[in-house]
């Protein structure tokens, strides 16, 4: 359940621990699955800020590509 995963990650992120970037990345993925693009991007950005080599960088770029594709389609109708 995506909602439950987000709630669990919210709790985990209240603590300080090594590898916190991975939790932000996972929460970003959960938000992406809900098509909550802004929250997904925010969480990917947090992960990238903590770890520039995080896979969140690729995920961030993918979401931006998706959003840019949809916005272009809006103007071409």
Task: Tell what function each PLM region has.
Residues 15-16, 49-50:
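Structural marker of alpha-solenoid helical repeat scaffolds
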């Amino acid at each position: 359940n995506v909602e439950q995963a987000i709630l669990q990650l919210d709790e985990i992120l209240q603590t300080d621990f090594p590898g916190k970037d991975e939790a932000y990345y996972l929460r970003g993925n959960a938000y992406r699955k809900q098509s909550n693009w802004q929250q997904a991007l925010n969480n990917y950005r947090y992960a990238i800020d903590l770890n520039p080599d995080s896979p969140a960088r690729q995920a961030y770029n993918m979401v931006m590509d998706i959003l840019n594709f949809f916005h272009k389609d809006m103007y071409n109708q």
